[in-house]
Amino acid sequence: MSNAAQDTVKNVLFLCTGNSARSIMAEAIIQREGMGRFRGFSAGSDPKGAPHPQTIALLRHLNHDVTHLRSKSWDEFAGQDAPQMDYVFTVCDNAGAETCPIWPGQPISAHWGIPDPAAEDGSQARIGLAFHDAYRMLRNRISIFVNLPLAQLDRLSLQRKLDDIGMTKDHEDPETA
């Protein structure tokens, strides 16, 4: 891989059905964890119209920039004028099972299923814990991803590593598991 290709900022799209919690969190996490090497996006097959208030509150509490976060349809990323994605990750089982649009540029994709914190209907403490758990799982997986030696991996090896990340328990690193 050329140095120019290694230096290019990689576009990463995170998908879930409602685009209100997990995919929004992942977009914010990779913006920060990616250290300028990755640009995060998120979308949903049936977007809720706005990020979940608990998502925004948690991200603000953790000092993420939430200024540009919004709930949007994955159709925004399937058109000719959309930014070309290098990676597409589904973060919910519903989106993982849906027929996704054909993404321009043939990005590498993987499923990283995370339980939906917005589905928690217990006490405020349980809801808060569900959002924190989802954030932690996403941050762990994204941290592993952004630290992969991408320039040294062929497409098939990279696909295997991305699939392995999706199957990791939230406390494991696939490199040591």
Segments and roles (model prediction):
Residues 83-84:
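Alpha-helix C-terminal capping/helix-to-coil transition sites in glycosyltransferase folds
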Residues 99-177:
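Phosphate-binding/catalytic loops
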Residues 20, 93-96:
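Short glycine-rich anion-binding loops that position phosphate/pyrophosphate groups of nucleotides
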